[in-house]
Amino acid sequence: FLTETYLSLRRMENEIVRSLIDAREGRTKDQRDQITAGQIMWGITDSTVLEPIKVSIQQFYGIEINDFAATVAKTALWIAESQMMKQTEEIVQMPLDFLPLKSYVNIFEGNALRVDWESVVPKGRLNYIMGNPPFVGARLMSKEQKADVNTLFAGWKNAGNLDYVCCWYKKASDLMRDTAIRSALVSTNSVSQGESVANLWKPLFEAGIHIDFAYRTFRWDSEASQKAHVHCVIIGFSSAANPKEKVLYSGGHAQIVHNINGYLLDMDNVFVESRNKPLCNVPEIGIGNKPIDGGNYLFTQEEMEAFVQKEPQAQKYFKPWYGSQEFINRCPRYCLWLGECTPSELKK
């Protein structure tokens, strides 16, 4: 993210430098394109040309928990800096003072949820926060990750039902308070669905946070051999007043909207909160079908039959199991249901 952001800003900066030189020389774009790279510009006194680069990798800060990824990020920024420097030299048509690896890179190794972000960069020098936090569901976290959630959301209602990515929204919101800093995060779309909306966004909105723009659900795609099978959203949020119009992106289209609520809809901020008691005289509901065993107790028809051949007494403990795919395709799987199996039977 830092590398792509740096490259985008430097490309914009190069375009600005090119336009300023054209304006000073009184030439059009077509005339500029006729100038060869080998021509030298004489009599240069414009500071824009003498010192054309204002965007530096030293203005970018990052926190990465993995040491190898941190090293890769540093190297990528150095390479990007060198590439963009060459492009700038072609524009100003003169060599620039540049020594590879001379610039220091502010990539710090550590747990971003336990590091004080102001120890990395004081918020008075910070303009934007962006990131692609880990995608880990509320029921799939490690003990360390669950401890991060409990620490950051101490005192929050239903914090145990929040996905891991919600920690970055909370951490960024705390840092942005009473500043002009703006944030944008890529997240699983769970942060804008179900009980996460009331659990996360209601307290944040009450604390003065608002959503500036959002990309509604899209499928995450990459060139990696093992692609992440997740659906994502991008949410830009801040606490400072924003004179710009709010924009909601969906399916390649952008829409100017009055408000963006926690469900990423152009509606008022309403919240559907969980209840443990029904509104009328109807039976209470339970959790229902919730397979979070890692698939260890789920069997296909063939797997179930092979298991029963080895353990015939297990036949009575197999129950048909239907999820959405099994129901639609009429291809049931089986669950080894040991809730009624006594310890003595298990020992046989």
Predicted regions span which residues?
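Signature of N6-adenine DNA methyltransferases within the class I
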Residues: 3, 10, 70, 78, ...
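Flexible phosphate/Mg2+-sensing switch loops adjacent to catalytic phosphate-binding sites
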Residues: 9-58, 81-101
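Conserved SAM-binding motif I beta-strand of class I
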Residues: 60-63
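Conserved SAM/SAH-binding beta-strand->alpha-helix loop
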Residues: 66
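Conserved hydrophobic/aromatic beta-strand scaffold that supports enzyme active sites
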Residues: 232-236, 321, 335
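C-terminal segments that line or cap access tunnels to active or ligand-binding sites in enzymes
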Residues: 330-338
